[in-house]
């Protein structure tokens, strides 16, 4: 019996080591993953914080009507939609994390741009740049989080990542309206959003990503920017 125990012990030990190695390899909660979750939450929190108060800001400071307010605010969404088809191509062609951080930095700085926008025209320009950077940083964040998580837990990891946006969406507008109703100035609100993105940018810069060789450049074609097979899924989501 004792000899049998000695004979099977190495096998059990090897199985235990192998099981531990697999668990470590498939580990989802890592410092990098936590940093990217925080970066995404803080980015969306700054975004949603201003969504309900921007109409009041445009109305009070620029004396704009409701239709003009709608057009100005929609410039952001239109700009984000226009850049998204090219975002994937850029992220595959160039280094992903630097491009992600660059887009995050531009997105962050536009909150400061709102503070110095002395005319409606300048505000619209900042709004368009803000939308372009938002389209880039959101796609870049999705790419980075996929790169740093184990493929076996990709669905779970993306679910938690998307939850950060939902959480920010649930508390950001409420927080913004609460501050506005409490008499907080618009400049202070912009600073809060700016500060949120500063913290998010710091978290994003701490994420360590594996090296991904750039995709070989191919001739420019429509399928590089629009995946026709994905059109039905996109229409159903719309």
Q: Predicted regions span which residues?
A:
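Juxtamembrane intracellular "pre-TM" segments in multi-pass secondary transporters
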Residues: 23-30, 209-237
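Helix-loop boundary and gating motifs at the non-cytosolic
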Residues: 29-70
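Residue-level signature of mid-helix packing/kink "hotspots" within the transmembrane helices
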Residues: 77-85, 169-170
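Helix-to-loop junctions at the C-terminal end of transmembrane segments
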Residues: 83-95
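Structural signature of the two symmetry-related core transmembrane helices
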Residues: 98-112
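Cytoplasmic helix-loop-helix junction between adjacent transmembrane helices
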Residues: 128-164
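Symmetry-related core transmembrane helices of the 12-TM Major Facilitator Superfamily/SLC fold
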Residues: 189-204
């Amino acid at each position: 019996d004792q000899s049998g125990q000695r004979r099977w012990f190495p096998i059990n030990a090897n199985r235990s080591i192998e099981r531990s190695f697999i668990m470590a390899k498939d580990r989802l909660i890592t410092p990098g993953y936590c940093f990217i979750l925080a970066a995404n939450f803080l980015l969306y929190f700054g975004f949603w914080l201003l969504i309900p108060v921007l109409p009041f800001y445009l109305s009070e400071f620029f004396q704009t009507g409701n239709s003009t307010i709608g057009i100005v605010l929609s410039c952001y969404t239109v700009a984000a939609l226009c850049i998204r088809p090219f975002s994937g191509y850029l992220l595959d062609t160039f280094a992903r994390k630097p491009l992600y951080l660059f887009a995050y930095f531009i997105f962050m700085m536009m909150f400061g741009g709102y503070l110095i926008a002395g005319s409606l025209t300048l505000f619209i320009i900042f709004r368009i740049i803000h939308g372009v950077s938002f389209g880039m940083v959101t796609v870049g964040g999705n790419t980075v989080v996929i790169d740093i998580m184990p493929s076996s837990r990709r669905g779970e990891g993306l679910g938690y990542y998307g939850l950060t946006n939902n959480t920010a969406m649930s508390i950001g507008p409420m927080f913004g309206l609460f501050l506005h109703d409490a008499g907080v100035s618009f400049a202070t609100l912009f600073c809060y959003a700016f500060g949120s993105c500063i913290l998010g940018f710091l978290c994003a810069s701490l994420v360590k990503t594996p090296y991904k060789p750039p995709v070989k450049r191919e001739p420019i074609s429509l399928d590089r920017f629009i995946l026709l097979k994905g059109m039905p899924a996109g229409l159903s989501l719309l």
